[in-house]
């Protein structure tokens, strides 16, 4: 594989093990990336197994050509939030044995300065997962009011200096528009000092802008609900998150569907009726990468894997 598509998949063994793969099963890799998880899933599938991958990054679709000769594999160009629609179009709703979701930005996306995700490499201020559509980060910064910008930084980046950063960006953009990642990163580094060791002051702002312009959290909500619709009984859901906002959504989703409906005290509803509303059960505890994996791949250090199983309908 070319270096362009090289990528170390995070929690690879643990994530695929969580799927409890059947050789003749049907599986969804909702975040294909550069194919690391898909390759591992295919190793566990027999001749009659099937893997459907999804990704909205055009470069990921190109990377999927590595599996062009494998009849078990197919890929859809689109967002993982629409996975239920894609599966339903294939007539596979309720027949899927496992769904894998990895919410991290792939290393090739971060390392390619032209994609505009990295504050360490100068490139166009883009940040779109699908760079064929939607507004760029530069366009968003140019158009957004100070209060709205501060809200995004605080909500999606958990940035404590959100208002100060937004005001400084607005003051500077009135003189010269922000078109490059280095221009934005350098401004934030000048006005803010990160109190977190080995963390660039622009980390949270870049995260916030990326999440916002790609509607990432909305996509996560849609993908989780979609997985619930397409999974067969005893089907597995393996989800990797990379920051607290993502993990909080996944944790609450699994908890909500594991507990069933909340019933006010005194209502004549039986335990059996409540059990019918329990759609998932958590499988094991949240898993974090080993010390060895973090040493080999520093980008894995914040990852968390959660696994759940679809209960009977």
UniProtKB/Swiss-Prot annotation:
Keywords: Cytoplasm, Methyltransferase, rRNA processing, S-adenosyl-L-methionine, Transferase
Main EC class the enzyme belongs to: transferase
One term under GO cellular component: cytoplasm
Family the UniProt entry places it in: Belongs to the methyltransferase superfamily. RsmH family.
Entry protein name: Ribosomal RNA small subunit methyltransferase H
Binding site for S-adenosyl-L-methionine: 35-37, 55, 80, 102, 109
GO biological process, one term: rRNA base methylation
NCBIfam families xref list: 16S rRNA (cytosine(1402)-N(4))-methyltransferase RsmH (TIGR00006)
Source organism: Shewanella violacea (strain JCM 10179 / CIP 106290 / LMG 19151 / DSS12)
Catalytic activity, as annotated: cytidine(1402) in 16S rRNA + S-adenosyl-L-methionine = N(4)-methylcytidine(1402) in 16S rRNA + S-adenosyl-L-homocysteine + H(+)
UniProt keyword Cytoplasm, yes or no: yes
One Gene Ontology term of the molecular function aspect: rRNA (cytosine-N4-)-methyltransferase activity
InterPro entries: RsmH, SAM-dep_MeTrfase_MraW_recog, SAM-dependent_MTases_sf
Gene: rsmH
One Pfam assignment: Methyltransf_5
């Amino acid at each position: 594989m070319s270096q362009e598509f090289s990528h170390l998949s995070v929690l690879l063994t643990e994530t695929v093990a969580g799927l409890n793969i059947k050789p003749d099963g049907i599986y969804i890799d909702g975040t294909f990336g550069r194919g690391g998880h898909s390759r591992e899933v295919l190793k566990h599938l027999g001749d009659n197994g099937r893997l459907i991958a999804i990704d909205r990054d055009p470069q990921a679709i190109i990377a999927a050509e590595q599996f062009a000769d494998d009849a078990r594999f197919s890929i859809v160009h689109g967002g993982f939030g629409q996975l239920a629609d894609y599966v339903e179009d294939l007539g596979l709703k309720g027949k899927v044995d496992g769904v894998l979701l990895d919410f991290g930005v792939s290393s090739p996306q971060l390392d390619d300065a032209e994609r505009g995700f990295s504050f360490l490499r100068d490139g166009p201020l883009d940040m779109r997962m699908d760079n064929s559509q939607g507004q760029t980060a530069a366009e968003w910064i140019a158009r957004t009011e100070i209060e709205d910008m501060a809200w995004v930084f605080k909500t999606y980046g958990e940035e404590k200096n959100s208002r100060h950063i937004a005001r400084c960006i607005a003051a500077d953009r009135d003189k010269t528009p922000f078109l490059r990642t280095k221009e934005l990163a350098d401004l934030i580094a000048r006005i803010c000092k990160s109190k977190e060791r080995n963390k660039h002051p622009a980390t949270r702002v870049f995260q916030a802008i990326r999440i916002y312009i790609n509607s990432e959290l909305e996509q996560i909500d849609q993908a989780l609900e979609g997985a619930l619709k397409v999974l067969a009984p005893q089907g597995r859901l393996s989800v990797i998150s990379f920051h607290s906002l993502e993990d909080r959504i996944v944790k609450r989703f699994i908890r909500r569907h594991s507990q069933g409906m909340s019933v006010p005290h005194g209502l004549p509803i039986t335990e059996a009726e409540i059990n019918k509303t329990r759609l998932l059960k958590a499988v094991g505890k949240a898993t974090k990468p080993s010390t060895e994996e973090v040493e080999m791949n520093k980008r894995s250090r914040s990852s968390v894997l959660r696994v759940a199983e679809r209960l009977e309908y």
